[in-house]
Amino acid sequence: IKKKNSPTILKRRFLDVSNKNKVLGVYKINDEILTKAQDKIFCNFLKNMVPKYDLVIVTDYGHGLISKNGANLICKLSKYLALNAQVNAANIGYHSMRNYKNIDSVIINANEIRHEMRNRNDSIESLMRKLSLQQNIKDLIVTRGTLGSVLYNKKNNKINYCGAYAKVAVDKIGAGDAMLSIIAL
């Protein structure tokens, strides 16, 4: 798919050198949604490719590539679907994973589940149960930085906790992507 006015995405992150926290992110990106013709091409690509694989890993960054139709096809045609629908400085406020249903495995961080559920007060565990029911997610993992991760299995209605090995986060940029690739296997 060729999308006009779409140069290579440029992301500049400004970090606090003392704690490696991102202070500011400046993004140069064309995150407009695909045209109807482009979406049709992309959906045809998905129809042909997704059924060929035992595992489909989707990282939806909310930059306009995956339409509701595309997400529906991915969910319908995947034998096993692992999803990460991130909230970042370029998409906060309008990006959601609501287009995805019947997902085998989802990994998001604590801020992302709070954003998704529009809830900053309830426990992570109760939000996990609600999101799993709402989206029909079999296994939901929420990362919490140095507090470790919380894992929820919908079938057994069971919560498990996994402590973090690192007590100090050295570089958390990309940590969710790395966790997704490991958990999806």
Segments predicted by a language model, with ranges:
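Short internal beta-strands
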Residues: 1, 81-85, 106-110
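Conserved phosphate-binding/catalytic region of the ribokinase-like
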Residues: 33, 52, 59, 66-102, ...
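Short, ordered loop/turn segments at secondary-structure junctions
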Residues: 3-5, 61, 86-87, 111
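Short gly/pro/ser/thr-enriched loop/turn and capping motifs at secondary-structure boundaries
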Residues: 6-9, 88-91, 113-115
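Non-cysteine beta-strand/loop elements that form the S-adenosyl-L-methionine
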Residues: 15, 102-111
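Active-site donor-binding loop signature of nucleotide-sugar glycosyltransferases
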Residues: 28, 108, 162-164
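Conserved N-terminal subdomain of the carbohydrate kinase-like
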Residues: 1-55, 77
